[in-house]
Amino acid sequence: MKINHYQKGVGLIEVLVALLLLAVGVLGYSILQIRAVDASSEALSRSQGMLITRALAENMRANPGAQTNYPAAVRGFTNITAAPTVPSPTCYNSVCTPAQMANFDAYMAARSAFAIGMNITMADCPGVGSAPIKRQCIFVAWGNTTLSVSGTTADVSNCMNTSGVYVNGSNCLMMEAY
């Protein structure tokens, strides 16, 4: 019986190729898992931001006498770097004027946003620069996206351009309030 010796090691090469293919497959699956975790984190942040903006918008609708007070009240809490201080009166049990209630509602929204690493502001909605009654929008940003206020104007250019299109790569959302 004659044995062919030129076939030695071929089985080992096949095993190494199979292991290489398996490693590439596992690496691809790991990358998919990382992307899924990132997408879940982004979805959580968007949901939390929507809860904050919706709560503030509902408070604004419940306090129509102070609608003009809300933009300045919310912008007053935009550039905070520490937990905001409670305004006086607290408006939990005390009787407050509509303007005081607007300030307290803005504080509650800013406190909620700050607690989860977000920033909140209020500005004219995009595309209403010449409208007789300018709609107001609530903006919430997190991560590397910043919102700022200079004087009485909110700068949301890191979030959205003037025509209402989100900036590519920004972590923010906008809700029309009234």
Which functions belong to the PLM regions below?
Residues 2-54:
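Aliphatic-rich helix starts adjacent to a transmembrane/signal segment
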Residues 41-44, 51-178:
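Flexible, low-complexity segments enriched in proline/glycine/serine and punctuated by aromatic residues
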